[in-house]
Amino acid sequence: GWGFYRLLDSLISDLGYPGSWPRQLYKTRHGRRGPRIVVVGGGTGLASLLRGLKEYTINLSAIVTVADDGGSSGRLREEMGILPPGDVRNCLLALADAEPLLNKLFQYRFTGEEGTLAGHNFGNLFLAAMGDVTGDFLTAIKEFSRVLAVRGQVLPSTLKEVYLEAEYTDASVVRGEHKIPQSGKRIKKVSLVPADAEPLPEALAAIAEADLIVLGPGSLYTSIIPNLLVDGITKAILRARAPKVYVCNVMTQPGESEGY
């Protein structure tokens, strides 16, 4: 809505760029690439922010969590041994200049209660297939970006297979990103397994070169913090000279931030 665009105007204006997004869009299309903005997160919150930011700049880098293990993404990582494609796909489509029908196709989810395709998202399957064709997940993302004329880049925070583990205030522990909010317990801390996952070099470079670094919006413990747990990401953000902005969710989230 209007408040969202006012937020974006404020962020960009603070960097010395015109506040009016139509004016900035005009300049971007006529040779000015815009400020270098890095957004860290995952889930639908990150994709929503990217849709707004791409109207200001094509120098966008989305650093995305790969700890998801539920739904279609979880099935694909278990059956094919790939990184979960869901959050990456959402960000790619948010930054795409694709036709509406093509966008709708890549967001299509197979329905039905039986069959191997039931519950799978077509875009997830496409990314998985592209990974097989190109030989690795990062190249698959780059080729997907080319197909959809993506503005900017989408980068997994790590290429290591990682899982998210939560410890609650009652000392109980659960492993699995999709399980964490379901317990109804208050989260004490979350950690990555393994804890020494190496960051993607391209992600570190994007952070170092950024004019603005944005954290969120999104699920605090299962979308934003997992990126910061990747070894080296937090240090890179702290070292960067760019202003850092945390975009808080409008509402608290059951299973994650009640009472905050």
Task: Tell where the protein language model's regions lie, with residue ranges.
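Acidic, Ser/Thr-rich low-complexity segments on the non-lumenal side of membrane proteins
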Residues: 33-57
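Active-site glycine-rich loop that binds ribose-phosphate moieties when present
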Residues: 20-24, 189-204, 229
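Glycine/threonine-rich flexible loop motifs
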Residues: 220-230, 255-256
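Short gly/pro/ser/thr-enriched loop/turn and capping motifs at secondary-structure boundaries
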Residues: 67-73, 222, 244-246, 252-255
